[in-house]
Amino acid sequence: MLTLLEKFIQKIEEYNLIEENDRILVAVSGGVDSSVLLNLLARVQEYFKFSIFCATVDHGIRKESKEEVKFVYNMAQSLNVECFIKEFDVPLYAKENKLSIEEAARKLRYKFLNEIAKKINANKVATAHNLNDLAETVLFRLARGTGPFGIYGMKPRNGNIIRPLLFFERKEIEQFATENKIPFVVDKTNFDTKYTRNFIRHKIIPIFKEINPLFEQAVLRFVENVWELDSFVKDKLNVETFEFEGRIFFKVPKDEYILVEFIRRKTMEHFGRAPDKEKLDRLKKNLYKTSFKISFWGDYGVEISYGYGVLGKFIEHMNYECSMDCQNNVNFGPFVVKFGNNGIIFKKMNLTIRNYRFGDKTKGGKKLKEIFVEKKVPSFIRRIIPIFVDEDGYVFYIPNVFLDRDYLSKEENGISIKVEMKGGFWF
């Protein structure tokens, strides 16, 4: 049977959690889990050849926290690990931002960890979540009605976050601490069942363990199956995308399930929260429409039109107008207007580039609105695409949409115009 240290090394290698020359910032509270994690990483540091740093936080919730911060600092010093300390007033932050104490503490803690990681060029942050934490998270999210791919909440590796203790039960970790004389502090609030996670830990999980004494292992088997399914689905989400100024432009996949899952994942990945089921159900019900938009919260959501979509802050009508000297490149949102070679050559004129306006028409009298509908130009693109007009205000060119050939020049000394959409994405 493997020792905890041997199993620790095995899981690091199996999930590729640590690589040579990594710079790892370890989040340490002083509790048994994080104290053991710091000590384990110090023991395998020479084996994997990486650098360790430590960060600890005084949340300003308990009187004992100042002493606990000192404890962590001294432990880090004994292991020759540099330690960073931060104090927060979590109760005040929670009140000001209408958050629970748990959520406020988590937000501030991760903000600090990311700041320190950036400061010291740490490419990974290690947290001490264990198998019991995973089981508690699954039950908590199940109680809230979370979907299948959000239920596990944590993986051995999420971006730059690694969780080397995720496969170990708390009792294993406590036993290792005792056998190896690793000091740790006990946070008394961990026993206060007014906090949701503690209520699940001390009241709910014991009931499940009466049904199955190996409940945590059963949860792990379930979660590992979800991880595999999650990877399979992720491989299927090969949706063509282009990102610009915090928005994600994409071609709408034909499969409804792939579209909804793509939107759910991208929203979570970029904005830190996923749309609730009611919003995603509304999305599915509107798919028969040519154009529509669904708000997920405030002015953030998804807009779909003629087989294309944009995810993020809704695109407002851009208001711009400029007369061109036809020499320098100009940016209009995601569009770049280039003058010079390899473009469409127009007759020399005093041209203006601006946004679409109600009533715009061509020299032949056709309204732009009709052209947009005929060419199936997405509604959100209409608000931002550059419109080329002559000195009389007639539209003669809309890239990829309309071209009045009467304005083309047969001479090489005309005006050469080429319009590109950043990212190589075209509707």
Curated annotation (Swiss-Prot):
It comes from the Bacteria. SMART domains: TilS_C. The keyword Transit peptide does not apply. GO terms for biological process: tRNA modification. One of its GO terms (molecular function) is tRNA(Ile)-lysidine synthase activity. InterPro entries: Lysidine-tRNA-synth_C, Rossmann-like_a/b/a_fold, TilS/TtcA_N, tRNA_Ile_lys_synt, tRNA_Ile_lys_synt_N. Keywords: ATP-binding, Cytoplasm, Ligase, Nucleotide-binding, tRNA processing. It is found in: Cytoplasm. The keyword ATP-binding applies. Ligates lysine onto the cytidine present at position 34 of the AUA codon-specific tRNA(Ile) that contains the anticodon CAU, in an ATP-dependent manner. Cytidine is converted to lysidine, thus changing the amino acid specificity of the tRNA from methionine to isoleucine. HAMAP family: tRNA_Ile_lys_synt (MF_01161). Belongs to the tRNA(Ile)-lysidine synthase family. This is tRNA(Ile)-lysidine synthase. It comes from Thermosipho africanus (strain TCF52B). The lineage of its organism: Bacteria, Thermotogati, Thermotogota, Thermotogae, Thermotogales.
